[in-house]
Amino acid sequence: MYTVNPQLVVLVDRQQQLREVRYLSLYGTLDEASPLYYFAKQHLRAETLAVERRHILLTLKISQLKGYLCHLLGLREDIIIYSHKNNLEYSYVDNTIFNPFTMTQKKTLIKADSFLYNVYVDACDFLVVWVARAQDTPVPEFGSFEEVDANILKFEARLVEMFPELDLEFSIQSKFNNVFRTNLRSTGLRNIVKRNQDNRILFIKTDEFFITMSGNHFVLNNEALNLSIWDAQGRLAISSDGDTITVNDVRLFTELVTDSNLQMERIKGDITYRIFLLSPITSKIKLDIETSFIFVETATNNILLSADKKISIILAKNHISIKVKNHIPNIEKYFTFLVIFINRMFNAVQQAVDFTKIETIYWSRICQNTRDKNRKPVIVSSLDANMERVSDNFFRSPTREVFVNSNNIMFSCVDPLGKYNSVGFLAIFYKLQKMCIPCCFLRSQAHTDTFISCVHHRELDRQLVSPYVLNFGKIVTEAKISFLPILFDQFFNEGLRIEFEADHKRLKATDGYHVVKCCTRSEITRLRTQRDIIQFVNAEQNTLIAGDMVYFPMHGARSAGAEHQRVYILIQEIVHEVVMVQKAHDSDRIRFRELERNRLWEFFPYRVPSARIKEEHGLVLTTDGFYVDGKLFSEPLSTRYVAFTENVGTAGVAAKYFAPVFKYVVTEARELFIKTWLLNVMMQLGLTGESSAAQTREALERYYRLS
């Protein structure tokens, strides 16, 4: 849980004696355990602290801060603000801390209107601002008066009001991107290795002859030289190829790199924080009032910039990404706090966010207004006096209906044309994920299954499936079925019979026919990218149809038995299943049967029978893997140890032998996949770069005969 730290405003007189000490806290109470309280009592010797539920926004410019302080202290005269720790409005060329009561050389003073969090480095944790009337100092000409920005006060008032409602529970991952061009080379990296005592380290020097093995993986690296050092938490702290170095842990870097001749030229430097939220937010923020003193809007409504445009913030439903140029202690936590508050303030109606988007289906697309149709419900603040309660969440009067969702947001249909005034619910949302999403209809929806479920909380028999068969392409709910695409319909249903009613859509009877139904999973499975598809197919160990492509699992050659008979199919990025459907003439009940045989396996391009290569003392090496006492060895190996094996080319005898298989491979890194495949095969068969072409081909045909 993030705690917004208190702040101190100290007003002093001509003798620098305390006149007022304001303790600003959004919690409205003194935190006697805080460093600030200790500072006020032990160092300032303040007898009393005036506690106020106020907060100085750390994103203010110094001129805005001065206006805020004038208003806070009730001053209508020139003031000078300063700090005992940092320079604020004025600074010396040599960065000596400015104090208006102990001036040195006026000529070396620089005045700047910077942002508070930039000039006061630990403002997030320990903010103390000193204020003096200009006439009480030896340099009254340095003072000025600023009017407070009314928008800042308005924003602060809303913050104070809503602060108790904010959920500031979140976790943070950080990544430093400090990249330098260096002259370390191989000798410099070896010296770092020698100085390292406690951290896990991997130093790789490769060429075209050798490949490094670490743990269960080949280290396939295009760099001839690579040094990686991890910290105690297992995070990559330092990485270098001799020419450039990436520093994620500055402290560790300074400990290990002591070469006085080291040359470093910064190429890139920033820090990315990824904040994971306990409570979701709305990723699209529209700032409706003046907030330029905090954020700057961009053309993309889920991206914000700080007021100085040096910090970028990307919003998502469950996390926030913040990129900063320079390290400012806890600034990522402070901006997360501001984002959560602004999201809460400007998007209160988005408590109904549950229907803004569900996977690929958008509420605004399905239930949208057009020139003569007003189907999108509006949010209302109260019920009419003459409304009758239909259920605990639905109310009706002769002219209006109101639905109250689980977040107590009230929706009603108010069509200026007087047509779409009946509140109903989108069936597809409810059938896919049991979500009651309101929409406006021409006629009462009280008779529909979805209305009965959402309003009266009565679940209907979901085993009843409509005998009407949909054309392929629409998302299929649990009460529907659809045809397969024409190509696959002909393939799967060759020789099978099906009868339809006269309208050719209503299923009359069949002893077995392949159709598409929804996946029987607790949640929708959505595959957005090719990577998603590959991961899904390999995890399920089943086939997937996507467009005109059929995806087989990587290890499909090992087994195509009963457990590998499922066939999935992708419709609008949602995973569905291919099943057999049965229906008798005298019944409307549709029955489903899992596939007895997946004919797609006949086309799997790599069917190789398992063969034993070597066996000794209960250890068996096969083309399928390494077995210990009959069990496949799959234990993760330690990455603390490094071994080497001979490199392979992707154009040799083995590569040409497997070329008929490789042309079917779908991967994001084709060359690395082929090299890994060949390395595994060559190691299993004990082949080396010195093996002749005839010897290599003979071994491949013996153990990996392609059918």
From Swiss-Prot:
What's the superkingdom here?
Viruses
| Protein keywords | Activator, DNA-binding, Transcription, Transcription regulation, Virion
- Cellular compartment(s): Virion
Task: State the Pfam families in the record.
Answer: Pox_VERT_large (PF04441)
Please verify whether the record's keywords include Transcription: yes
Family recorded in the similarity comment: Belongs to the poxviridae VETF large subunit family.
Q: Which organism is it from?
A: Molluscum contagiosum virus subtype 1 (MOCV)
Transmembrane feature ranges: none
Broad class of the protein's primary localization: virion
> Subunit arrangement?
Heterodimer of a 70 kDa and a 82 kDa subunit. Part of the early transcription complex composed of ETF, RAP94, and the DNA-directed RNA polymerase.
Q: Name one GO molecular function term.
A: DNA binding
Its function, per the record, reads: Acts with RNA polymerase to initiate transcription from early gene promoters. Is recruited by the RPO-associated protein of 94 kDa (RAP94) to form the early transcription complex, which also contains the core RNA polymerase. ETF heterodimer binds to early gene promoters.
> What is the name listed in the Swiss-Prot or TrEMBL entry for this protein?
Early transcription factor 82 kDa subunit
An example Gene Ontology cellular component term from the record? virion component
Q: Could you tell me the Gene Ontology terms of the biological process aspect for this record?
A: positive regulation of DNA-templated transcription
> Is Transcription a UniProt keyword of this protein?
yes
